[in-house]
Amino acid sequence: MKGYEVNFDGLVGPTHHYAGLSFGNEASTKNRNNLSNPKLAAKQGLLKMKALADMGMKQGVLAPHERPHVPMLRRLGFTGDDISVVAQAMRYSPELLSSLSSASPMWTANAATVSPSADSQDERVHFTAANLNNKFHRSIEAETTSQVLQAIFKNERHFVHHEALPQVALFGDEGAANHNRLGGDYAKRGVQVFVYGQQHLNNGLPGPKRYPARQTREASEAIARLHRLDEAHTVFVQQNPDVIDQGVFHNDVIAVSNQQVLFHHQHAFLNQDQAFAEIRQKMASIGEDFISIEVPENRVTVDDAVATYLFNSQILTRPDGGMTIVVPEESRQNAAVWSYLNDMIQMGTPIDAIQVYDLRESMRNGGGPACLRLRVALNETELNAVNPKVLMNDQLFMTLNQWVDKHYRDRLAQEDLADPHLLMESRMALDELTKILGLGSVYPFQK
């Protein structure tokens, strides 16, 4: 049976703003309090989705979350009707309101970890929503993420949904941003590579000193168990703590995979040779080669990789069998990065083409092409069981652009978050979106 990789991109929400909430993410911190353009951000994301669908890729849409998150504001002691709750939060704690108005669910690489049926002992696709407990503004996402995923992947014969891991540091989980799957055809068994930043139950191991390691080995191992993965085809690798301290807050800022290929920086992993030997051996056990494309420090520094999000790219297998790398405009603007990319596609590796997209609104908040998408490998039967209303086509692209034009503002500052009209505009937009995408009532305000 034929297999597909379906990319589910997050639609940017109406409250997209620059709050600098993500310590360890240098772009997020640098652009704090800049004016944002939610309408442009949403349209930039939609353009990328449509372009990839037009290339013959399977492309889906994940809905934004309800923001401001009034239920959490109430848990924190603000009272009255919803508009009063938001007004009080702005008066007494504007930083808290900003945090609970973040459009961060757009970065769906952090939404969940997904294991395809070919790798799972029960031959079903497994989803575990990420708890994202390292950052308060993201720790509230798991419940809505699970609701949205269950509305898209409903059929229990094919899909299993697990609760997020416990909300404690021991099980810090940032989802697919720290997870790679290597293999051949998407419908056949692969090797899953879980990347972690620290191991809580073994304090003797090295860890970062400047910025937090958001993913723990304990979380990755728990997900592998939940997803019923075979140890013989699962690898756990520690990310180099030195690059975390240089702003590599997720593994998808320093490495990206597709099928047999792992595209990565020279300094991406701790004990890299040992890790790659294990990956190579486990790939051989499923009859596949392992192709490492390593970018040396003397061609692209870690600082340039972080600034341009070279590795926060997508590697896509085209219908003709070749691979295209999708990079942000910032990669083209950097001479060293652009020179390397153009040399790489002449090296005889499977990656032989480059596509560039302007995702500046997301990039300024610290998220590139790979942050915006959740990869789901499906066979033909499973793809047919997916809610078809979320799959990108000409009609959906037109409908969503019209929806954005109708509901989104073209500028947003932090002080606008208390505007009662923004709360009502956002809810009206999301209520309409759930009908467009056939999601049902997934938001707290709809219940």
Swiss-Prot record:
Keywords attached to this Swiss-Prot or TrEMBL record, sorted alphabetically, are: Arginine metabolism, Hydrolase
Which terms under GO biological process does the entry name? arginine catabolic process to glutamate; arginine catabolic process to succinate
Could you tell me one molecular function GO term of this UniProt entry?
A: N-succinylarginine dihydrolase activity
Q: What is its EC number?
A: 3.5.3.23
Q: Residues that bind substrate, according to the entry?
A: 19-28, 110, 137-138, 214, 252, 365
Pfam families, per the entry: AstB
Superkingdom of source: Bacteria
Determine if RNA-binding is one of this entry's keywords.
Answer: no
Q: Please name the catalytic residues of this protein.
A: E174, H250, C371
Which ranges form a coiled coil?
Answer: none
Catalytic reaction list: N(2)-succinyl-L-arginine + 2 H2O + 2 H(+) = N(2)-succinyl-L-ornithine + 2 NH4(+) + CO2
Its pathway is:
Amino-acid degradation; L-arginine degradation via AST pathway; L-glutamate and succinate from L-arginine: step 2/5
Q: Family assignment?
A: Belongs to the succinylarginine dihydrolase family.
Q: What does this protein do?
A: Catalyzes the hydrolysis of N(2)-succinylarginine into N(2)-succinylornithine, ammonia and CO(2).
How does this chain assemble? Homodimer.
- This protein is called N-succinylarginine dihydrolase
Its taxonomic placement starts with: Bacteria, Pseudomonadati, Pseudomonadota, Gammaproteobacteria, Moraxellales
